[in-house]
């Protein structure tokens, strides 16, 4: 059920006494009303499973874990607000002949450019059909042909038709189904407009944690109630990071504004292991519209359906870069488009669908058709202006095959995690199935050990002392924009040693400014998101500098060749 928490009354002794609720109180004996700072109210809650995030990963885990104990879902916006809702193309699984597991495995390994964990790839591919069946049983409707078989699509990097989809709104269909199921599950509590600030570890008991600290444990999280303005100490036996991606570290992204890398940043600050952050996937084709954020995704399935990329001169340029043409993997297509734009000085390239059947386009891609039509583009007659946009993080919180991080009692699933499936580049439509497989496995694993876990009662409440209202919001908003500009200009599709060095120097200045501001300011969503984006940006830069080669999604003009193929 959805929770609406009312503020608790407080009673403090001192010069007179304080009495009252949320933001104001009566100072007895003085006869005046004194305004209390937001986030003054103290509250503790306990739950077996604390799930941070409400996309396919978080909601699927919650539904499975509810069989083992009480689940609390924390999401910083509405329950349905997630990256999942924006996924258009589909979800990949072997569902018909002549496709088979070995072909899907091979396609995934090729896309991952020598960096995939083959054991993980095999596990996900082989379990994928069962997880698809789970979604179907929950009520997700995938498109079928007239003969009743599934209407499987083919996307870049896939050698067979294996993409199940619901029109071009697959993510939205999955999210809607899961949201309804979660709302009707009595063992799940939902906390909307609640922002996870930090995960709780031995650090909050006074220990000094370093990377080599033995057996770091997670005991829950500090969570800000954004509506009632208080910080809740959530104590949990199991904590699950399902916070999605971090696309908003860049100026142009297909991600919604909530994608600020919160989970990755929290785990990094808690000394968890983060890996492969240099591998940021830029979707090759977002609709070119400088005044709109997030960028509207022009699904890869359109190219699978037959759409062709052209430069401003009308040339089908992709064959110059890869024999697969417009159906090459995303990293190749994104770099090709980026090069064409820079070579000709253009703001975008074209995606041409005009040679395709108009009725078929409208039927298979109603979302793209309607969205473009609203902007004066009839995709059955007009070329679509497209540009690459930050889309997906292949790196994240390192986990094992059950979704466990190196921090005990802490799991990570979905885009926030790094499982080894994607390697240096994600194969199209492999993200939703990864989330479904790992949320299932994480729920089974954590549920099986729940009885041996206890709450850590010694965790102190949030300390607001020494903080006051944010001095000037402009300090946050301008730094937010500056981080995005630094990352876009210097740490984008094509990188160099000099660009990365400059990005690091400038980001360090912003980091120091924001940390000082954070420590003396009351909690706000924006300052926390900026803090997380700075951490994530630093991780991308650091790992990009360490990679002295070009591989997958990481391309450096100073190190254009690939070195060893070791994982």
Outline where the language-model segments fall.
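Glycine-rich FAD pyrophosphate-binding loop
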Residues: 67-88, 97
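Conserved redox-cofactor binding core of oxidoreductases
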Residues: 137-230, 235, 242, 286-289
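An anion/pyrophosphate-binding glycine-rich loop and adjacent beta-alpha core
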Residues: 266, 272-384, 436, 445-451
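Glycine- and aromatic-enriched mobile tails/lids
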Residues: 43-47, 64, 78-80, 87-92, ...
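Glycine-biased, low-complexity coil/linker segments
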Residues: 13-16, 20, 28-29
């Amino acid at each position: 059920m959805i929770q609406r928490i009312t503020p608790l009354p407080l009673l403090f002794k001192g010069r007179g006494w304080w009495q009252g609720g949320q933001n104001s109180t009566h100072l007895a004996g003085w006869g005046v009303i004194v305004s209390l700072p937001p986030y003054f109210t103290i509250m503790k809650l306990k739950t077996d499973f604390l799930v941070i995030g409400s996309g396919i990963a978080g909601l699927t885990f919650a539904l499975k874990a509810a069989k083992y104990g009480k689940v609390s879902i924390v999401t910083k916006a509405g329950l349905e607000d997630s990256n999942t809702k924006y996924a258009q193309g589909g979800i990949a699984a072997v569902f018909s002949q002549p496709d088979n597991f070995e072909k899907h495995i091979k396609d995934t390994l090729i896309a991952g450019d020598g960096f995939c964990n083959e054991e993980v790839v095999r596990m996900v591919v082989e379990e994928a059909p069962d997880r698809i069946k789970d979604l179907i049983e929950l009520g997700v409707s995938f498109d079928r042909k007239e003969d009743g078989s599934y209407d499987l699509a083919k996307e870049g990097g896939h050698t067979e038709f294996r993409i199940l989809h619901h029109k071009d709104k697959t993510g939205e269909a999955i999210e809607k189904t899961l949201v309804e199921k979660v709302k009707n599950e009595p063992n799940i509590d939902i906390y909307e407009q609640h922002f996870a600030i930090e995960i709780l570890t031995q650090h909050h008991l006074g220990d000094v944690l370093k990377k080599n600290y033995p057996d770091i444990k997670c005991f829950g999280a500090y969570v800000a109630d954004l509506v009632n303005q208080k910080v809740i100490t959530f104590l949990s036996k199991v904590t699950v990071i399902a916070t999605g991606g971090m696309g908003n570290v860049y100026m142009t992204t297909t991600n919604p504004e909530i994608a600020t890398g919160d989970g990755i940043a929290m785990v990094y600050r808690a000394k968890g292991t983060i890996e492969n952050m240099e591998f940021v996937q830029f979707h090759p084709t977002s609709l070119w519209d400088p005044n709109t954020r997030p960028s509207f995704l022009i699904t890869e399935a359109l190219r699978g359906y037959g759409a062709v990329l052209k430069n401003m001169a009308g040339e089908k340029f992709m064959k110059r870069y890869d024999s697969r043409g417009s159906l090459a993997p995303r990293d190749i297509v994104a770099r090709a488009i980026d090069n064409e734009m820079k070579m000709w000085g253009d703001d975008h390239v074209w995606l041409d669908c005009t040679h395709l059947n108009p009725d078929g386009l409208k039927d298979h891609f109603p979302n793209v058709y309607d969205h473009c039509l609203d902007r004066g583009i009839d995709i059955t007659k007009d070329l679509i202006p497209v540009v690459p946009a930050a889309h997906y993080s292949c790196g994240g919180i390192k986990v094992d095959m059950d979704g466990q991080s190196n921090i005990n009692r802490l799991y990570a699933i979905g885009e926030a995690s790094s499982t080894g499936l994607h390697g240096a580049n994600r194969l199209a439509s492999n993200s939703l199935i990864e989330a479904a497989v790992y949320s299932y496995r994480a729920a089974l694993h954590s549920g099986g050990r729940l009885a041996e876990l206890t709450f850590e009662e010694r965790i102190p409440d949030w300390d607001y002392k020494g903080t006051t209202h944010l001095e000037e919001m402009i300090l946050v908003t301008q730094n937010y924009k500056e981080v995005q500009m630094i990352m876009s200009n210097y740490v984008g599709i094509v990188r160099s040693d000099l660009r990365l060095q400059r990005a690091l120097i400038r980001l360090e200045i912003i980091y120091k400014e924001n940390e000082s501001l954070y420590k003396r300011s009351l909690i706000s969503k924006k300052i926390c998101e900026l803090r997380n984006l700075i951490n994530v940006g630093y991780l991308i830069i650091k790992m990009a500098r360490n990679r002295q080669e070009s591989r997958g999604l990481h391309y450096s003009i100073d190190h254009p060749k690939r070195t060893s193929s070791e994982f």
